[in-house]
Amino acid sequence: MRRLFDADVAVAEVDPREVDPEHVLLPVERDAVARAIDTRRLQYAAGRHCARSAMRTLAVPPGPVTQDDDRAPRFPPGLVGTITHTQWWCAAAVALESTRAALGVDVE
């Protein structure tokens, strides 16, 4: 996915099966998927893991990625981003809001 974006966009990818939601999710994120099935919880955790990894690449403090009422990811203030996944792959792209108005990728 890296090749889809310019250098000012940080990208991270992971196999959701390699992520432990209990160790990755922040409390506010954990609450959002407390009643979700395991597959959804894994994909949600993998997306947040990738998003925070991308934030670190941008040298910004990694924060929670909550969700809007339509389940779209809501990034911390000053950041824009996107999260996408399949059953076996998850990725996030994050940029500073000062350089991008929005980002979007959907693989399915």
Describe every region a protein language model picked out.
Residues 1-108:
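Core catalytic alpha/beta fold that binds nucleotide/phospho-ligands
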